[in-house]
């Protein structure tokens, strides 16, 4: 577990690591976290939100994957769902689980990475907690990510 002040102290380090990720097109600071647009493939965009979970006191991820469809010079984005084989082929979930839920504040649907086992996966040592966390969890989206 990580207190909000500890999280806020470490989030600039995560931002610094993610700016080195070649696939990031945009990174924005938001309240208690970061929002990224990541080009996973030529026609696949990852909308990624890193935020502090005030209930579990751990960093968390919510995301959406979009497929860029172009037909007769008209482009549109299509939200990918877990039933899309395209989405399942992109995610490297391993033992991680995701759930689909509505973000009431944003009035939008997102996938959430289950954060119940965060401390077991990352360890409870506060020093460099977020660096260890991002190094593990970002690999869900890019196995080649190296912090």
Swiss-Prot record:
Keywords from the named record: Autophagy, Membrane, Protein transport, Transferase, Transport, Ubl conjugation pathway
Superkingdom: Eukaryota
Assigned EC number: 2.3.2.-
Phenotype for residue 99 to A: Forms the ATG12-ATG10 intermediate, but reduces the formation of the ATG12-ATG5 conjugate
GO process terms (BP): autophagy; protein transport
Catalytic residues (UniProt): 116 (glycyl thioester intermediate)
Membrane topology qualifier: Peripheral membrane protein
Localization of this protein: Preautophagosomal structure membrane
Outcome of gene disruption: Impairs the formation of preautophagosomal structures.
Broad class of enzyme this protein falls into: transferase
Positions in coiled-coil regions: none
Function: E2-like enzyme required for the cytoplasm to vacuole transport (Cvt), autophagy and nucleophagy. Acts as an E2-like enzyme that catalyzes the conjugation of ATG12 to ATG5. ATG12 conjugation to ATG5 is required for proper localization of ATG8 to the preautophagosomal structure (PAS). Likely serves as an ATG5-recognition molecule.
Similarity comment text for this entry: Belongs to the ATG10 family.
Additional comment: Kluyveromyces marxianus proteins are shorter in length and have a more ordered secondary structure than their S.cerevisiae counterparts, which might contribute to the superior thermotolerance and solubility. K.marxianus could be therefore useful as a new model organism for further elucidation of the molecular details of autophagy.
Subunit structure: Forms homooligomers. Interacts with ATG10. Interacts with ATG7 and ATG12.
Protein name (Swiss-Prot/TrEMBL): Ubiquitin-like-conjugating enzyme ATG10
Species of provenance: Kluyveromyces marxianus (strain DMKU3-1042 / BCC 29191 / NBRC 104275) (Yeast)
Lineage summary: Eukaryota, Fungi, Dikarya, Ascomycota, Saccharomycotina
């Amino acid at each position: 577990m990580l207190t909000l002040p500890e999280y806020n102290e470490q989030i600039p380090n995560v931002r610094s690591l993610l700016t080195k990720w070649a696939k990031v097109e945009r990174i924005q600071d938001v309240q208690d976290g970061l929002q990224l647009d990541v080009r996973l493939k030529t026609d696949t965009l990852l909308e990624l939100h890193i935020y502090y979970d005030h209930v579990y006191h751990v960093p968390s991820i919510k995301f959406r994957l979009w497929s860029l469809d172009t037909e007769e010079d008209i482009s549109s984005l299509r939200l990918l769902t877990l039933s899309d084989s395209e989405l399942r082929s992109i995610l490297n979930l391993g033992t991680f689980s995701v759930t689909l839920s509505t973000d009431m504040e944003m009035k939008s649907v997102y996938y959430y990475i289950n954060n119940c086992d965060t401390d077991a996966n990352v360890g409870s040592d506060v020093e460099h907690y977020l660096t260890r966390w991002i190094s593990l969890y970002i690999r869900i989206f890019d196995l080649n990510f190296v912090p």
